Each structure stands twice: as C-alpha cells, then as structure tokens.
A protein has these predicted regions:
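Short, ordered loop/turn segments at secondary-structure junctions
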Residues: 36-38, 79, 103-106, 134-135, ...
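Rossmann-fold NAD(P) dinucleotide-binding segment
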Residues: 64-73, 81-103
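Conserved N-terminal Rossmann-fold NAD(P) cofactor-binding segment
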Residues: 37-69
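N-terminal Rossmann-like dinucleotide-binding module
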Residues: 1-49
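Alpha-helical support elements that line or immediately flank enzyme active sites
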Residues: 132, 138-151
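C-terminal helical cap and adjacent loop that interface with cofactors, partners, or active-site loops
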Residues: 266-330
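Active-site-lining helix/loop region of Rossmann-like oxidoreductase modules
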Residues: 6, 10, 148-268, 275-277, ...
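Rossmann-fold NAD(P)-binding glycine/threonine-rich loop
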Residues: 103-127
C-alpha cells in the first residue's frame, strides 16, 4: 500500500477510534485529525478516541484543515446532516477525496440542488466522494445484488437485519434515531437508509420500480429501560422496526426489513437482535438462494474496515459523487 496517500480524519467517536486503529495496520499516513468541539482541540487523537498516544493533535477548524493541503483523503466519521454536507462541499472545492459512512447512494440521499453543486465542484477540482459501510453498504444491498446475478431474472429479493443498538453511541441513538423522545411514526433515518439499499439492488436488477412503500417505524418502550446509556421511559422511543418494499408492475420485487433494539430489553430479546442477516432470493424458475449471516454484533470495526478499504478504490473512479457499488469488490 502506498505511503504517499495522506489521510485526514473527522470525528472523535467510536468509528473514529476504529479508523485510527485500522490505519495503523496499513501503509496510509494519518496526517490530520479534526474534531467538532473546540474543547477537544489540541488533544492527541489516539488518546481522545480511547487508544494509545500517536503524536497527532486534533484541530477544530474543518475548513482550514481541508484547505491546508495536509491530506489527500478525508475519512469522515461524524454524523449525517449539515456538518457532513459542509465537509463534502469543502472537500469537493479543495480537490480532497472523501470516504464517509453517512449514505451509499447519492441519488437517494442528496437533494438534486446540492448534488448538482457538489458534482460540479468535484469534477472541477478532481475530488471523489463515496460512501460505504455495513448497513447500508453491504448486508442488505451489495451482498444480495451480487447473489442475484446467479439466478435467472426476474429475481425477487427479501432481506432482514436484526441489530443490537446498545453499542451505537448516544449521539446516534438520540440525534439520528430519536431514542428517548416522544417521536412517532416512520423511523426517518432508517427508512432513508433502506431506500438507498433498495435503490442499489434495483440498479443491479435493472428495475424501474413503479412503487415504493414504507412500513413500520419507531417502537415505543412499554416500561422504563436503558438503551445504550440513554434512559428511556415508558412511551418513549426505544428502537425501530422499519421496512421498505419495492413493486414493479404490481408485483413485489424487493422487501428489506431492519429492526434495532437493545438486546437486553424485552423487545430485543423477542426479536433476536443478535446481529443476524437473513437473505432470500428467488429466481424466475423458482430456484432459491437462502443465506444466514452471523454478522458481528459490533458494527463499528467493520464500518471502519470498509472505509479504509475504499481508499484504495478511489483512483479508479472519475471525479464526482459515487454510490458504494462504484468501488471495486475487496
């Protein structure tokens, strides 16, 4: 692996810690570390993320860091939202590549105006921006799309993922999932991710998809509990059970379901939140592929591994925003 590739890191949470550890085992050089809070600036990124000192102090000025010329690729390990959009715009303008885990299909996740602006900047500067991860990014999209190529068309795909959300971190649980709140209805963030996964599969199957339905949503606790360190009272959000179904010509072609609860809660125990992934693919001749994946309970090491692996695939991509399927396998 070339030591000429300099890597910048944004974030100080679990994913950032796994990235610091993973990068040590590669030839890539971690040359900058950016944090959201100025209070955390000046600290060693290794120590800040729960590891050993590596001799790299953090900074909090993202714009200045991106424009500094100190790194070629930014590994963004922050939350989705305005900060992520800002980071993409800065990288696209400065000619810095970015790998993130906030979305995997820009056509679904990024509105047309922003997507057009980012694409124009990136194509002008030479920047490549791509998202990857485990879900979305592997279990419910890349893997079934690959398996579908072994069956005669038209193929019908069903996938289900059960997650223990205990290790997801309070920022994600509270700000992205609404755990501990009185929100109700669709699990908006999860629904968007499932729609991205469905779009990746639809691309592989060459489906137009005349109708997409969302079902299920946020789940309320029946009694007081604790989810990943977040206190949840009865009637507040403790997790989700979300589903997306894609139809073509009135027939179901793709059904993706994702449930997430703390394993020690009653609902988590009942639904088997053990990290498992179930895939069922049916070909036109009724031939079937059925797969059970005993996926790791902790998604963070795998997410970091996918992000680091993506660095090597960037040179082969043209400048612009890309879905995770644009990356080479492996």
């Amino acid at each position: 692996v070339s030591r000429d590739i300099r890597v910048g890191l944004y974030g100080s949470g679990r994913t950032a810690g796994e990235l610091v550890a993973a990068l040590k085992k590669t030839g890539y050089r971690l040359t900058a570390a950016v944090v959201h809070s100025p209070r955390r600036a000046g600290q060693d990124i290794g120590v800040l993320t729960g590891g050993d000192r590596i001799g790299l102090a953090t900074v909090s000025d993202l714009a200045r860091a991106v424009r500094s010329g100190r790194f070629d690729v930014l590994l963004y390990a922050g939350l989705a939202g305005e900060r992520h959009q800002e980071a993409m715009a800065l990288c696209a303008a400065a000619g810095v590549h970015m790998v993130h885990a906030c979305f995997v299909h820009p056509l679904i996740a990024v509105d047309e105006e922003l997507r057009g602006r980012l694409s124009e900047l990136a194509m002008s500067s030479g920047s490549r921006i791509v998202g990857t991860g485990m879900i979305p990014g592997l279990w419910l999209d890349v893997l079934p799309a690959l398996l579908a190529s072994a069956l005669p068309a038209p193929v019908r795909i069903r996938g289900r993922r059960a997650s223990d959300i205990s290790s997801w971190g309070s920022d994600v649980l509270v700000h992205e999932l609404g755990v501990g709140s009185r929100l109700a209805g669709t699990a908006t963030r999860i629904d968007l991710l499932l729609r991205e996964s469905a779009h990746i599969i639809a691309d592989a199957l060459r489906l137009a998809g005349d109708r997409v339905e969302s079902r299920g949503g946020l789940a309320m606790a029946s009694s007081d509990t604790v989810v990943g360190g977040v206190e949840v009272r009865a009637g507040e959000v403790e997790g989700f059970d979300q589903e997306v179904v894609v139809y073509e010509n009135g027939a179901e072609r793709i059904r993706l379901t994702w449930s997430g609860f703390a394993a020690r809660t009653a609902r988590g125990t009942a639904q088997g939140s053990d990290g498992g992934v179930e895939l069922q693919l049916l070909g036109a001749d009724q031939s079937e592929i059925a797969v059970h994946v005993a996926a790791p309970l902790d998604p963070y090491p795998g997410t970091a591994a996918r992000m680091v692996s993506a660095i090597g695939g960037l040179p082969a991509l043209p400048p612009g925003l890309h879905p995770t399927t644009a990356l080479p396998v492996g």
